[in-house]
Design a protein with these regions (language model features):
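Helix-enriched interaction subdomains in cytosolic or periplasmic regions
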Residues: 37-59, 166-170, 179
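Structural motif corresponding to the C-terminal cap of alpha-helices
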Residues: 14, 53, 57, 194-198
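Short charge-dense sequence patches
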Residues: 2-4, 20, 52-62, 141-143
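Short, solvent-exposed loop/turn segments at the edges of secondary structure
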Residues: 23-25, 46-47, 232
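Non-heme iron-sulfur electron-transfer modules
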Residues: 12-42, 56-81
Length: 265
């Protein structure tokens, strides 16, 4: 429809200039700028172009198949399935089903995930606490040796922010904390400490993360996010929309969902 909203949000607000107008006249379309492909365009994967498109011409990668399809892990039970949920997802799933905040408790969300077939359900807030502790400890260490570090110190918990800084301000990369994001900390815990706790080989654990941001999909695929040497610490990332879509496809009676506790790592 040539509304150019994706171009405007990326250029004027995000300042990345990933999208641009291609061709002219009746053949005018939107494409990645400077003739590049999306992998070469320094995209931060913030998802704003997707959010602002009124006709869904842009969309994030759909990763439901390896989890929920007939040959997916929940149906074949080839591995122990573990899922972690970000705090922001609690509110978003409630809005999708028009549930009150009081009714859509974290425990009810945990109950929904167990109903779907996950063996273990974790709350990512545990790993968020670890991130705060790690970043806080690192900050104190830097304060003791100010002359050895570049300032200020930036958080590294958001992969979209990290990608943005690396592409737009490479001279400030050393300001980033060395701590992993909560998602990846939780993934490392699941494939290491928790695998040991339940006497399971990390290779036999299928780790799923439900997050509000599509940048998490790229983060989990980074080669550095393999703490066991057996594969990614987080195997699949689903965004809130994918999770809600699958819930709706199951025709789950959300008002009949039982409350259940999150597992303790």
């Amino acid at each position: 429809i040539k509304c150019m909203r994706c171009i405007q949000i990326c250029d004027k607000v995000q300042s990345l200039k990933v999208w641009d107008i291609a061709k002219t006249g009746s053949r005018t379309t939107v494409n990645v700028s400077l003739g590049r492909n999306i992998k070469e365009a320094d995209c931060a994967l913030c998802g704003q172009c997707i959010t602002h498109c009124p006709v869904a011409a842009l969309s994030g990668r759909d990763d439901k198949r390896p989890v929920f399809s007939q040959n997916g892990m929940l149906n074949t039970r080839r591995k122990t399935t573990v899922v972690q949920v970000a705090p922001a997802v609690r509110t978003a799933w409630a809005e999708a089903f028009r549930l009150s905040r009081k009714f859509a408790s974290p425990e009810r969300l945990a109950g929904a995930l167990r109903l779907m077939g996950f063996d273990y359900v974790f709350d990512t807030t545990y790993a968020a606490d670890l991130t705060i502790m790690e970043e806080g400890s690192e900050f104190l260490e830097r304060l003791k040796h100010k002359e050895d570090y570049q300032w200020p110190m930036f958080t590294s918990c958001c992969p979209g922010w990290v990608r943005f800084l690396k592409s737009q301000y490479p001279d400030m990369v050393d300001c980033l904390s060395t701590a992993k994001s909560p998602q990846q900390m939780q993934g490392a815990i699941i494939k290491n400490y928790f695998a040991d706790k339940i006497h399971e080989d990390p290779e036999n654990i299928f780790s799923v993360s439900i997050m509000p941001c599509i940048a998490k999909k790229a983060e989990c695929a980074l080669p550095t996010m393999d703490s066991t040497g057996t594969g990614p610490d987080v195997d699949v990332v689903l965004n809130t929309r994918e999770f809600v879509d699958y819930m709706k496809s199951l025709n789950i009676d959300v008002y009949g969902l039982p409350e259940d506790r999150f597992d303790s790592p």
